[in-house]
Amino acid sequence: MNAAASSYPMASLYVGDLHSDVTEAMLYEKFSPAGPVLSIRVCRDMITRRSLGYAYVNFQQPADAERALDTMNFDVIKGKPIRIMWSQRDPSLRKSGVGNVFIKNLDKSIDNKALYDTFSAFGNILSCKVVCDENGSKGYAFVHFETQEAADKAIEKMNGMLLNDRKVFVGRFKSRKEREAELGAKAKEFTNVYIKNFGEEVDDESLKELFSQFGKTLSVKVMRDPNGKSKGFGFVSYEKHEDANKAVEEMNGKEISGKIIFVGRAQKKVERQAELKRKFEQLKQERISRYQGVNLYIKNLDDTIDDEKLRKEFSPFGSITSAKVMLEDGRSKGFGFVCFSSPEEATKAVTEMNGRIVGSKPLYVALAQRKEERKAHLTNQYMQRVAGMRALPANAILNQFQPAAGGYFVPAVPQAQGRPPYYTPNQLAQMRPNPRWQQGGRPQGFQGMPSAIRQSGPRPTLRHLAPTGSECPDRLAMDFGGAGAAQQGLTDSCQSGGVPTAVQNLAPRAAVAAAAPRAVAPYKYASSVRSPHPAIQPLQAPQPAVHVQGQEPLTASMLAAAPPQEQKQMLGERLFPLIQTMHSNLAGKITGMLLEIDNSELLHMLESPESLRSKVDEAVAVLQAHHAKKEAAQKVGAVAAATS
């Protein structure tokens, strides 16, 4: 099969210079007119999932891909011209340098398209790119031809030509290694000498007189500022390398006018930057090796701990070279560093001090890591989690729910911490039993829905949704976590002139509630967790029970242990008698409205009479506002009927 696949003609395009917001759908809309598209992939960062600025478009026919390359190259998508070329999966062909041309001294106005149009006359171009930064073109570019012959022809014709009134250099592309080798060879035969740290009294003539003793000089220059003042450095160019080398050997470190001068080979800016970078990396590696295994990171520090106290706490374990609490605006940031003289001392300090309470907080002590190491470690952890999820068999998610009592599904394996459970549409359908509340008291949109997938949010407030012309509110809803639900039961009960049937049954059910004891789970109830594995849950302290006269005390554990369809019933049985003492005529309506609130909030209301009264007052205000609006509408209707 591989042999057959390799014989297929190329029909894959690389699309670069993409805007970060460009998606596969946009590219499909762009490229599908050229012909049938098999697939499109925008390459993204593994962690952030942000676009990397390029994509691959695979066509069914090579002719369609070629048509797209010819007609759509440099078209604009979301304000940026795209760059299209044939996808070359073999990196050795891209990096070989065959057919690759380097152009420099370009005018800022020349972009990818202008460069492509200029050089396409010499042969088929595989890729063409002007190098840019945030300020625009950097003045150089690369053109990769299909053949070396086309590249040689372009170099011969274009090198030294004027493009936008600027003489450009066009030559064969050279790798960094080749360029460094050439610079090294030139450095060995240098003739230009750099001199610095001399006084202001030294001018061109005195500098020439000083250095001409070593051989014939071609030029001597002291560098000056716009005011003509010497900058304290200059250059001397010799005719022969031997003379320049002799000047460096004899003059470097000599004293002139009370100052010790530096004399060395004159370097280009690129060389100096490369040398400084090498020195910086060398110092960095030395520092890393020096502090490897001896520098400790301590966090969760008490605010009263300063550098001296930190040193005092860790000094029993060995010789401390430095101890520092990190500060911000003079206040402790809660972490610091302690550096020991040997790895053995640092290891002992970690063993003894990690978890020890100093001041009022337990310390976290570990070997300090560089930012790059921490980032790599976190990335590795993330990738392992992703790989573990992908390694699950296809039916793992579908089979992770086993039937429990009442036809509900509970997880057969623990869910990932902090993540909401995943349910397939079929499972959701199975999880909706016939509602216990035949009329009212349950929102239509959330009948039988387990609390694990109900959206949570801040404390709810009652709001009024567009009523109809019936005798009482057609739709009264609770705003919980940004979602509203219709109270159809209130409509039914009000149209019949009574209270909801389910609410009417609360009082009789309350009398026999104590006869039906429920299992108590060893964990605290939370609206986002349902039926976790009891073996992995820590035991909790006894929880306060909500006492309603004549009923079994209700705890969060009892509520969590009950099937979801019974939880609202249990809460309603305890809410109804409390609300009836406040507003006996509206108790049924208000109870049905309050049952839309999240279970944890309802438990809080049962424990706090002030909170319950506040919510009841809100519900009464909504009902009264609706009643007033309905009366006003009836009066308007009566007046209209009389006038007609």
Swiss-Prot record:
Modified residues (Omega-N-methylarginine): 419, 432, 436, 454, 530
Gene3D superfamilies in the cross-refs: 3.30.70.330, c-terminal domain of poly(a) binding protein (1.10.1900.10)
Single Gene Ontology MF annotation: poly(U) RNA binding
Source lineage: Eukaryota, Metazoa, Chordata, Craniata, Vertebrata
Gene that encodes the chain: PABPC4
Annotated compartments: Cytoplasm
Organism domain of life: Eukaryota
Modified positions (Dimethylated arginine) in chain numbering: 518
Residues in cross-link Glycyl lysine isopeptide (Lys-Gly) (interchain with G-Cter in SUMO2): 361, 375
A Pfam family recorded for this sequence: MLLE
Tissue-specificity statement: Expressed at low levels in resting normal T cells; following T-cell activation, however, mRNA levels are rapidly up-regulated.
Protein's name according to its UniProt entry: Polyadenylate-binding protein 4
Organism: Homo sapiens (Human)
Domain RRM as annotated: residue spans: 11-89, 99-175, 191-268, 294-370
Keywords: Cytoplasm, Isopeptide bond, Methylation, Phosphoprotein, Repeat, RNA-binding, Ubl conjugation
SMART domains, alphabetized: PolyA, RRM, RRM_1
